[in-house]
Amino acid sequence: MSGVKKFIPLLDRILVEKISNQATKTSGGIFIPTNKDAPTNNAKVIAVGTGSVKLDGSFIDPIVKEGDIVLINPKARSNTVPWGDKTYHLLSENDILGIIEN
């Protein structure tokens, strides 16, 4: 996808970039390392489609927005999208389990 400036997913599709596992800090200030090679289910939303279509033809707006940090279903089937020097994943909004707020 070299030369592409913007990618707009169709319908309920969401383009995400998975976030690598990092050490977590306890309330006491101790860092607990995580296995950086373990698969991560956290991702940043890069682009959002227009939403789902109801049976009557009207749209259901997407719940997530660009920039959200989300938890993805570990069994989600996604398409890998190489773009520039990064790899993104295209999945259905139904595969997002929740939005992570800090």
UniProtKB/Swiss-Prot annotation:
The UniProt record lists the keyword Cell membrane: no
A cellular component term, taken from the record's GO annotations: mitochondrial matrix
Cellular location(s): Mitochondrion matrix
Database matches in InterPro entries: Chaperonin_GroES (IPR020818), Chaperonin_GroES_sf (IPR037124), GroES-like_sf (IPR011032)
Primary localization class, coarse: mitochondrion
UniProt-listed GO biological process terms: chaperone cofactor-dependent protein refolding; protein folding
Keywords: Chaperone, Mitochondrion
The keyword Transport is annotated on this UniProt entry: no
Subunit relationships: Homohexamer.
Function according to Swiss-Prot or TrEMBL: Eukaryotic CPN10 homolog which is essential for mitochondrial protein biogenesis, together with CPN60. Binds to CPN60 in the presence of Mg-ATP and suppresses the ATPase activity of the latter.
Family note: Belongs to the GroES chaperonin family.
Protein name: 10 kDa heat shock protein, mitochondrial
Classification lineage: Eukaryota, Amoebozoa, Evosea, Eumycetozoa, Dictyostelia
Gene that this sequence comes from: hspe1
